[in-house]
Each structure stands twice: as structure tokens, then as C-alpha cells.
Curated annotation (Swiss-Prot):
HAMAP family: EF_P. One of its GO terms (cellular component) is cytoplasm. The keyword Cytoplasm applies. GO terms for biological process: peptide biosynthetic process. Belongs to the elongation factor P family. It is found in: Cytoplasm. Pathway: Protein biosynthesis; polypeptide chain elongation. The keyword Transmembrane does not apply. This is Elongation factor P. Pfam families: EFP (PF01132), EFP_N (PF08207), Elong-fact-P_C (PF09285). GO terms for molecular function: translation elongation factor activity. PANTHER family: ELONGATION FACTOR P (PTHR30053), TRANSLATION ELONGATION FACTOR KOW-LIKE DOMAIN-CONTAINING PROTEIN (PTHR30053:SF14). Keywords: Cytoplasm, Elongation factor, Protein biosynthesis.
């Protein structure tokens, strides 16, 4: 469906020359003289190349229809990451390029938001937090509880993060999936 370039927002998916792009940033520029323009910074979904385009605010852009649904992560193999729609039991395979760094946080049975275009996965949204176990970290030093310094730790998924000094190996912690940072100790 055609929409005015000025109405696009961050996260929208547009179809340009048969390729899909996700909008990263939109800036409406109104110069003192001349026509107002909309500056779009986008990323091509197929290969991750970043593109910058300028449109007059009256020009139209083809907005792609994207279907967002909950899917359950099943497993990963040589083909890619396998997901199942819990309502229809249809299975989809997402390529490693679509999943990117988020694959480290996927666990069997995890429910995620999968965005598809013509039944092809194009984007993944994880839950805000995940609970993981610390497998390796430096031992805590007595008397260091009052300092605000953090120490490096390796999580059960292989990701490195910084944790407070009182956290020991074997402790289950809650991690923010957007940046991999420590949130709090798990209460289980």
C-alpha cells in the first residue's frame, strides 16, 4: 500500500525495487527555502546493507504488509532457526542473517514475536528479559560488597556480561535481551 514518505516511522517495512527495507530513522527537514524533504535511514532485510534515501514529503513509498505473530522456538540446525505457530502448528525456518545476535538468547520452547512478509521471516523480537545461569566468573573478594564495580561473567549461552561482585558461578540471573546487561538475580 502506498503511503506518504512523511508518514513513515521507525520500524516500518518498505518495499523499494522489489527489496524489503526496515526504517531505522526518519527525519523531516523543513528548509527556509525550498521543498520540505523526509530523510530515511533504512536497512535492507536480505543482506543488512544500510541505505539513506531522501523523498519530498508529498512523494509516496510502497509500505510492505508485515504480519507479526507469536511463534514458539523449536530448534536450530544447518538450515537455520525453526519456529512454530502455536495456533496453526505451521513451521517456519528463519535464516541466521534474520536472527543475528539474538540467536544466543533463544531457548527451546521460548515464545517470541516473529515478523513475516509473504510467509518469509524478516525480523525477530525476543521477550524483554531471559533467565540464564552464570557458568564462569571471578570469585568475590570479601569486603568488596559496597563498591559499585562490576566483574566480567560468562553466561550459559556463551555471552559475556558484567555482574555485581557478589554474584558467583552457578547463580541464575535475569538478563536484558536488548543489550545483554545484568538486570537482577533470579528469584527461583
Amino acid at each position: 500500500m502506498k503511503v506518504a514518505a512523511s508518514s513513515l516511522r521507525k520500524g516500518f517495512v518498505v518495499d523499494m525495487d522489489g527489496k524489503l527495507y526496515v526504517v531505522l530513522n526518519v527525519e523531516n527537514i523543513h528548509p527556509g527555502k525550498g521543498t520540505p524533504v523526509t530523510q530515511l535511514n533504512m536497512r535492507r532485510i536480505s543482506d543488512g546493507v544500510k541505505v539513506s534515501e531522501r523523498y519530498r514529503t508529498t512523494e509516496t513509498v510502497e509500505r510492505a504488509f508485515v504480519d507479526q505473530r507469536d511463534h514458539t522456538f523449536l530448534y536450530q540446525d544447518g538450515e537455520g532457526y525453526h519456529f512454530m505457530n502455536p495456533e496453526s502448528f505451521d513451521q517456519l525456518v528463519a535464516s541466521p542473517e534474520v536472527i543475528g545476535d539474538l540467536g544466543a538468547y533463544l531457548a527451546e520452547g521460548m515464545v517470541v514475536q516473529l515478523s513475516t512478509h509473504n510467509d518469509l521471516p524478516i525480523a525477530l523480537e525476543l521477550p524483554r528479559t531471559v533467565t540464564l545461569e552464570i557458568v564462569e566468573t571471578e570469585p568475590s573478594v570479601k569486603g568488596q560488597t559496597a563498591s559499585s564495580s562490576y566483574k566480567p561473567a560468562i553466561l550459559s549461552n556463551g555471552v559475556r556480561t558484567m555482574v555485581p561482585p557478589y554474584i558467583a558461578a552457578g547463580t541464575r540471573v535475569i538478563i536484558l535481551t536488548e543489550d545483554g546487561s545484568y538486570q537482577e538475580r533470579a528469584k527461583d
